[in-house]
Curated annotation (Swiss-Prot):
It holds the Pfam family RNA_pol_Rpb1_5. Its EC number is 2.7.7.6. DNA-dependent RNA polymerase catalyzes the transcription of DNA into RNA using the four ribonucleoside triphosphates as substrates. Zn(2+) 2 binds at C811, C885, C892, C895. Belongs to the RNA polymerase beta' chain family. This is DNA-directed RNA polymerase subunit beta'. It catalyses: RNA(n) + a ribonucleoside 5'-triphosphate = RNA(n+1) + diphosphate. Zn(2+) 1 binds at C71, C73, C86, C89. It comes from the Bacteria. Mg(2+) binds at D462, D464, D466. GO terms for cellular component: DNA-directed RNA polymerase complex.
């Protein structure tokens, strides 16, 4: 009964359920149907009575009453008059909240154009009428007339006439022979008279005839818009408005401030402007004012409406009283402060608090300490309910009083309320999903939240004043989700790479490391202990120390659960750690019987998690944390200045390097090397010196010393312990403390040639200090900038991947990727095992020798399988990938593989796209914040030689070598590779060897591991001669194409090729070095039938004199490379963004599209033409134009393979896709992005990058439309195209064809099928305009759109609920059909009224 009475006063209208949202252009009739009345006056409210003015912007008659159930004049009050309209003031008696939903309208005296359809590119009005935007604006803003009906005159339709021309035309033809109009009326007439179907047919016909590409583009653009209008049922003339809707007054409130002033929404000012101008125009028309005045007023109305819809889009920005631009309707939606991002995608929530965090080492992993004061406030409603239920209070008011006075029973009840009620803790910035986790609260005194030390890594929290927010999940479902999904004990593994994230750090690591140290000659060495009790006894009586070498018996259980014991050589400390290990046959004492560095601890936790499950792991982690803290405290490790040992050999090493640097200086003075080469060599030498000093220092710090008095080992160096264990500090920082600081970088990224020889212990000189401040400040400035960049990258990634959800179990595709280990400069960077773990095998994996099946296709590759695969020596495995998944919406579980955060196959409904975006974005932010930790010390990244990484036999592919005049073997080929094979003939490693390198091995040689195979100069690119002969110069004209520069400091001259195209006289030159067969210099030597002529590019340094004798393989010229820049994620983050945005790099590589022979064609002024004649006769030759002066490797007649680089550089991803296909592109993007992160030591699983790349490759560009409705150039979803083509083929029609295209993440986000998602991302007005014209329907498939309309997202639990609803709907339909069939129409009707209807909201 109680409920019904309550509902009488506050009737809740049932929320309308809907399945999709449609957006279209509002017709004038629609606007009138929304409106509750016309607004005629610009007044808002009466400033004395505070009552709204009648017919004004806040009129109560139109919009509804100010107070609930009370008319304006006060004649009718209270519920009993509900629904009556007062005859005196005309106000309906109802709830005041209707003022939030009732709209009004303004009748305009002259039509105006809607600025979005006019100006938002491409301008819809101008494209439809096939006029330029300028012309349309001239007509709209009353500058020119436009001919709407030429009649029989010589005027053309749509011709623009100025005032004079119009008058002349009237004089010439007479007023009734033609019609020309001005203003929005003219455009309205033109749009209203358009026959869209006819125009569409004409355009299609014209398209099929035209050949010019430009014309085709223009026609396609216009045809698209015409088709959009036809399909959506919008009329073009609706883009010109005659009535303007006015939004409800409570959405643009007028709030009285104290002192009799008002704060108002900007929209009211903008509406007032429109009404004022419109009323003035009406009056002028009534008074029959002169045309020029009326026209001016009409223009003012148009401008006022423009400002209302989109202030500042055209003309001056309209400002308010305080010179601030007014916020128009568009500004309300746009940007970070707009409706979408401020209120719909992120809301402030109730039941939350924030406070400083402190460490809580005595907590269990699933607990957090919550201050009593906070808990009391957060759980108030629960406390009131419990007080009521227990009979302490009968009303909420009483309960409130009890709580405010903090009665003792309140605390008891608070204890009951929070028991088993998890709370969420969040630390900003929340970069990945581990930034919010659930804990069970433990009440504590004080005002700070206590946080468990092990979850700090996940939150990236420290206790230097960080704050965290607490949220209370209210409903039972929310509590359940918090407990099952978000509890800190359920988030042990990192979603980015599957490694444990709950790993001890800092003090805990130090404590465990200290426990696991072994020392020589400690008391009690060699004793044997049978169990842990004996050991503790011995330790307490100081018979042994923690580090003594002893033998200890360790008990474990075998596979049958029986207890087994084994004797180990170990130390008491290690036995103490081993005691905590869970008993399991798969976990041996060996994982503890080693130095417990952070890496090893992580491996240990991983093992425990994999074999013993989650519960054991959590208990184990808590225990080792306690142990670590307690022993770090007992060890009392600290360090002083004297712990930093400076190596004795430092002076000698520095002196040697100084001598070297002097020698390079001398070589430079003698003209043997250039300025750039000298710089590179000096930087290299100092880099090596720094490393050697650092190595010596490390050796000295690590050294084990014995005390001569006691004969015992001296305690280990504390700094070394901290760094080596991974607790704090790195080798790099130690190097700066006790070695030498080394080379510094300038803010531009160049390295300063003079190094900092001192370290921090010795102290820097003033000069050195100044040099080091240079790089350090850059680091700090970078940090601030890069944080923003990284956050923006994450936002774009989330946006592009948000609808990648696991939606099916198996898509059944036969496609996949081939995985191989990644080798860089002979080092295996990522092993095959790391890359395939947790993926699904595409086909059976067979043993290469015996042929037995190691793993069946379609099975998940687990740790045990990886071990078998690596044992068998398999080098490549085919796996399934999200990239090749064929699920329509989302990804299937088989293609995705293992859920890294759980270690099990991924569940349906998991939002893998968002996880991928977070995994890639989170380290970006982390790294950008870390650039300055090295204090700007430069790290030079470059290699100049190659060493064998395996023993084996050498095989050379595409062998092309010659011996030069010094007797070295020089590589002459472009794609030569050295393979090393092991005894069984299996390829172990492949190295591409660059042109001009010297190699020290030949085919069939046997090499040892670490033997040098080849070396090259990393700073210059050589140009070699392929024949023996005498040098001659061609087109080398002094001052035009060559300059002899004398170095100021040395006076030595060198010849340098300069840009000959800069001078008009040099336009036709082709500088080259030619090799003559004889001394006279007449005949030119031949090589493979072509003349030995070597084209020179700009900045080449000539190494030979004319007439000198050269042998094949000698260097005739060198092209200096960029000096070594330092590599840091600062270069890395923009690189990642560049790859994900699929931008063409500056100076990108040119890739050969076909395999064939190279020919040179006729060059242009500053381009060279290169033609590839394909080996395949059926193909046409392909031409490339290459800027002259760029280094071009090939000579005429060379063979080139498809996919080879004609010009070096970073390839453009689009070219890779077009030439080599999707798989090559995917592996290129994955490897490039991984390389950036690997440099920083960040591990991200490949599958995350693949998910993002999949989203970038969703679209196909239509090339042939066939019998489909597509237009060439349309971008269509590839799976949608496949479905449509299958239908077309089934009907015997011609299918459409297209090429896959790669979209950058921003473009791909804006092209999602959901306009709500796209509008909330970027370019809101453009997206909404486009969607409205084509009458788009958003089916609410992705996550973002559902958040915006306020529903559960279709992932996780929300996805399951949605699925249940779908099944229920199908079941209901079946029951209704059955009832109908059996004649129970009444029952069926009743059921139908109760069933949810599927509606589309407009």
């Amino acid at each position: 009964m109680n409920h019904e009475v309550m509902n009488l006063f506050n009737p809740q209208s049932p929320a309308q359920t809907f399945d999709s949202i449609r957006i279209s252009i509002a017709s004038p009739e629609k606007i009138l149907s929304w409106s509750y009345g016309e607004i005629k006056k610009p007044e808002t409210i009466n400033y004395r009575t505070f009552k709204p003015e009648r017919d004004g912007l806040f009129c109560a008659r139109i919009f509804g009453p100010i107070k609930d159930y009370e008319c304006l004049c006060g004649k009718y009050k209270r519920m009993k008059y509900k629904g009556i309209i007062c005859e005196k003031c005309g106000v309906e008696v109802t709830l005041s909240r209707v003022r939030r939903e009732r709209m009004g309208h303004i009748e305009l005296a002259a039509p105006v154009a809607h600025i979005w359809f006019l100006k938002s590119l491409p301008g819809r009005i101008s494209t439809l009428l096939d006029l330029t935007l300028k012309d349309i604006e001239r007509v709209l803003y009353f500058e020119n007339y436009i001919v709407t009906e030429p009649g029989l005159t010589s005027l053309k339709l749509h011709q623009l006439l100025s005032e004079e021309e119009y008058m002349l035309a009237i004089d010439e033809f007479g007023e009734d022979q033609f019609t020309a109009m001005i203003g929005a009326e003219a455009i309205y007439e033109l749009l209203a008279s358009m026959e869209l179907e006819k125009i569409a047919n004409d355009l299609r016909a014209e398209l099929s005839e035209t050949t010019s590409e430009l014309k085709q583009k223009k026609l396609i653009k216009r045809l698209k818009i015409v088709e959009n209008f036809l399909e959506s049922g919008n009329r073009p003339e609706w883009m010109i408005m005659k009535t303007i809707p006015v939004i409800p007054p409570d959405l643009r409130p007028l709030v009285p401030l104290d002192g009799g002033r008002f704060a108002t929404s900007d929209l009211n000012d903008l509406y007032r402007r429109v009404i004022n101008r419109n009323n003035r125009l009406k009056r002028l028309i009534e008074l029959r004012a002169p045309g020029i005045i009326v026209r001016n007023e009409k223009r003012m109305v148009q401008e006022a409406v423009d400002a209302l819809f989109d202030n500042g889009r055209r003309g001056r920005v309209i400002t308010g009283a305080n010179k601030r631009p007014l916020k128009s309707l568009s500004d309300m939606l746009k940007g970070k402060q707009g409706r979408f991002r401020q209120n719909l995608l992120g809301k402030r929530v109730d039941y939350s608090g924030r406070s400083v965090i402190v460490t809580g080492p005595e907590l269990k992993l699933h607990q957090c300490g919550l201050p009593k004061k906070m808990a009391l406030e957060l759980f108030k409603p629960f406390i009131y309910a419990r007080l009521d239920a227990k009979g302490y209070s009968s009303t909420v008011k009483q309960a409130k009083k009890l709580v405010e006075k903090e009665h003792p029973e309140v605390w008891d009840i608070l204890d009951e309320v929070i028991r088993e009620h998890p709370v969420l803790l969040n630390r900003a910035p929340t970069l990945h999903r581990l930034g919010i986790q659930a804990f069970e609260p433990v009440l504590i005194e004080g005002k700070a939240i206590q946080l468990h030390p092990l979850v700090c890594t996940a939150f990236n929290a420290d206790f230097d004043g960080d704050q965290m927010a607490v949220h209370v999940p209210l409903s039972l479902e929310a509590q359940l989700e918090a407990r099952v999904l978000m509890m800190s004990t359920n988030n042990i593994l990192h979603p980015a790479n599957g490694a444990p994230i709950i790993v001890p750090s800092q003090d805990m690591v130090l404590g465990l490391y200290y426990l696991s140290i072994v020392s020589e000659k400690e008391p009690g060495e060699g004793m044997v202990f049978s169990d842990i009790g004996e050991l503790h006894h011995a330790l307490e009586n100081k018979v042994v120390t923690l580090h003594t070498k002893i033998k200890g018996r360790v008990k474990n259980i075998d596979k049958d659960g029986k207890e087994v014991a084994k004797l180990y050589d170990t130390t008491p400390g290690r036995l103490i750690i081993g005691e905590l290990l869970p008993k399991n046959p798969s976990i041996s004492f060996d994982i503890v019987n080693q130095e417990m560095t952070k890496k090893n601890i992580s491996k240990m936790i991983d093992q425990v998690y994999r074999h013993c499950g989650q519960k054991e792991t959590v208990i184990f982690c808590d225990r080792i944390m306690q142990l670590g803290f307690s022993h770090a405290c007992r060890a009392g490790i600290s360090f002083g200045k004297d712990d930093m040992l400076i190596p004795d050999s430092k002076l000698r090493l520095v002196a040697e390097t100084e001598a070297l640097a002097k020698e390079y200086e001398q070589q430079y003075n003698d003209g043997l090397i250039t300025q750039g080469e000298k710089y590179n060599k000096v930087v290299d030498a100092w880099g090596k010196c720094t490393d050697r000093v650092a190595d010596e220092m490390m050796k000295r710090i690590q050294a084990v010393e014995f005390d001569p008095k006691t004969g015992r080992q001296r305690p280990m160096n504390s700094i070394y312990m901290m760094s080596h264990s991974g607790a704090r500090g790195s080798a790099n920082q130690m190097k700066q403390l006790a070695g030498m600081r080394g080379l510094m970088a300038k803010p531009s990224g160049e390295i300063i040639e003079t190094p900092i020889i001192s370290n921090f212990k010795e102290g820097l000189t003033v000069n050195e200090y100044f040099n080091s401040t240079h790089g350090a400040r850059k680091g700090l400035a970078d940090t601030a900038l890069k944080t923003a960049n990284s956050g923006y990258l994450t936002r774009r990634l989330v946006d592009v991947a948000q609808d990648a959800i696991i939606s099916a179990v198996d898509c059944g595709t036969a496609k996949g990727l081939t995985m191989q280990p990644i080798v860089d400069a002979g080092q295996i960077v990522a092993s095959l095992g790391q890359r395939i773990l947790g993926r699904t095998a595409l086909v059976d994996i067979l043993h290469p020798v015996s042929g037995e099946v190691i793993l069946e296709g379609g099975a998940m590759i687990e740790e045990a399988d990886v071990a078998k695969i690596e044992e068998a020596g398999i080098q490549s495995v085919q796996i399934r990938s999200a990239l090749t998944c064929e699920t329509r919406l989302g990804v299937c579980a088989k293609c995705y593989g293992r859920d890294l955060a759980r270690g099990t196959p991924v569940n349906q409904g998991e939002a893998v796209g968002v996880i991928a975006a977070q995994s890639i974005g989170e380290p970006g932010t982390q790294l950008t914040m870390r650039t300055f930790h090295l204090g700007g010390t430069a790290q030079v990244v470059d290699s100049s030689h190659l060493e064998a990484s395996y023993e084996g036999t050498v095989e050379i592919r595409n062998r092309n070598v010659v011996r030069n005049s010094e007797g070295h073997l020089v590589v002459m080929g472009r794609n030569m590779a050295i393979l090393i094979k092991d005894g069984s003939g299996k390829e172990r490693v492949v190295h591409r060897i660059s042109y001009g390198a010297h190699i020290f091995v030949d085919d069939g040689d046997v090499v040892k591991c670490g033997q040098r195979i080849a070396e090259w100069d990393p700073y210059t690119r050589p140009i070699l001669t392929e024949v023996e002969g005498y040098v001659g110069f061609e087109d080398m004209i002094d001052g035009l194409s060559v300059t002899e520069t004398a170095d100021e400091s040395t006076g030595i001259t060198k010849r340098l090729v300069i840009d000959w195209r800069a001078n008009p006289r040099g336009a036709d030159l082709k500088p080259a070095i030619i090799i003559h067969a004889d001394k006279k210099g007449e005949a030119i030597a031949k090589y493979k039938g072509a003349e030995a002529r070597y084209m020179m590019s700009v900045e080449t340094i000539l190494s030979v004199e004319p007439g000198s004798h050269v042998k094949a393989g000698d260097v005739i010229a060198r092209l200096p490379m960029e000096s070594a820049k330092t590599k840091d994620i600062t270069g890395g983050l923009p690189r990642v963004a560049e790859l994900f945005e699929a931008r063409r790099p500056k100076d990108h590589a040119i890739i050969a599209e076909v395999s064939g022979t190279i020919r040179f064609g006729r060059g242009y002024k500053n381009k060279r033409r290169i033609i590839i004649e394909p080996n395949d006769e059926t193909l046409e030759p392909v031409e490339y134009l290459i800027p002259k002066g760029k280094l071009f490797h090939f000579q005429e007649g060379d063979q080139i393979e498809k996919g080879d680089y004609i010009l070096d550089g970073n390839p453009a991803p689009h070219d890779i896709l077009a030439i080599k296909g999707v798989e090559a592109l995917a592996s290129y993007l994955v490897n490039e992005i991984q390389e950036v992160y690997r440099l920083q030591g960040v591990l991200i699983n490949d599958k995350h990058i693949e998910v993002i790349v999949r989203q970038m490759l969703q679209k196909v560009e239509i090339t042939e439309s066939g019998d489909s409705g597509y237009i060439p150039g349309d971008h269509v979803d590839r799976i949608e195209l496949d479905e449509i083509n299958d239908n077309l083929l089934a009907e015997g029609k011609r299918p459409a064809s297209g090429n896959p295209i790669l979209l950058g993440i921003t473009k791909a986000s804006l092209q999602t099928p959901s306009f709500i998602s796209a509008a909330s991302f970027q370019e809101t007005t453009r997206v909404l305009t486009e969607a409205a014209v084509s009458g788009k329907i958003d089916t609410l498939q992705g996550l973002k759109e559902n958040v915006i309309v306020g529903r559960l997202i279709p992932a996780g639990t929300g996805g399951t609920i949605a699925q249940i609803r779908r099944i229920a709907a199908v079941r209901d339909d079946l029951i209704v059909d059955e009832q109908r069939k059996s004649g129970n129409n009444e029952v069926a009707k009743a059921m139908l009224t109760n069933m949810t209807t599927v509606t589309t909201v407009e």
